[in-house]
Amino acid sequence: MSQNFSFRQAAVIGAGTMGRGIVMCLANAGLDVQWLDSNPQMLNQALGAVADTYAHNVRQGRIGEEEAAARRARITPVQHLAAMREADLVIEAVYENLELKQSIFRELDAALKPSAVLASNTSYLDIDAIAAVTARPRQVLGLHFFSPAHIMRLLEIVRGAQTAPAVLEAALALGERMGKVSVVAGNCHGFIGNRMLEPYATEARLMLLEGALPYQVDRALQAFGFAMGPFRMYDVVGIDLEWRARELAGVGQDQPAVQVDNRLCEMGRFGQKSGAGYYRYAPGSRQAEHDTEVDALVLRVAETLGYPRRDFADEEILERCLLALVNEGAKILDEGIAARSADIDTVYLNGYGFPAAEGGPMAWADRLGAAELLQRLRFLEQRHGARWKPASLIERLAAEGGAFADLQEAR
């Protein structure tokens, strides 16, 4: 017998930037929210930050005083998991460490009522590995919010191997209630958005070693219509997030593509928040300023790694970044991680600043045509190696004269 799930009482674990945004999303949508963090001082600071955000919204005329007070009143700090027993939904929003998340889910599984749904805000970790430590894997899923969560509209809803259809339906209803654009993704490393971001960012980073400079790569992509290029994006998000994740996992720090990032982080240049990353920022400013010190660093790293440098045209920068996105998107589509190409486009239009006029990476690729796409990928494979091997789906579409938009997997 299928069970229906309705979310009235929610809870959030984690009082960092993501936790704060998620709490506001839930409170803004009319849910009562309990909030827990292992550091009471951090939780108090986060409550203050939420109050400040609501006060700012009142000053801006976005909401009235009464509505701000009502939203604040829906948020209740708690000191232990037992206080969350009656929650219908708990969203974990701690930092990206699988063992930590598994530990939290074990405790939640033991403490919460049997009907509660457990969600992780992980941006790339294995949802099935998290669900496996509970006795309720059918009631575990990913709810990947994008930062800042109370502003960004995209929500990736990640279905695990055992996630019940009714749980997915409840999550979609919650997304609609919060005013989100929701996309259901299958479980894999990075899901849809961040899995595709990895080869895109890798190409951008490798082009630095081969002869391009950060401002040049960003300029080419912004001229195409991206809200910001990859290096400006990493400055906003924080260069140190991936750096710390690599350190924690003990994997990937020796890859040539991340050596400029590593040097920047070792210098304390974490991005906008530290006043310097790939760009410089004046005190209190978000305006990115070209920094010749970073250009010199790129040249030193490339020389140390033995990369011969050459001139780059904007067209090559654009092609390598876009085709990296599309080739990975084709694999995601073929594997059933995304049900349709339009879902991939929705993710990139609403979460990654892809130009709306282009319709998303897969729509852009369909206009190019599968045969042309395959030809360009084969050229890049010959020139740069196996990472450019065309996705099997692209080969099939080229042979059949088909398009990504023709494909749709019934769910």
Per-region residue spans from a language model:
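N-terminal glycine-rich phosphate-binding loop for ADP-containing cofactors
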Residues: 1-411
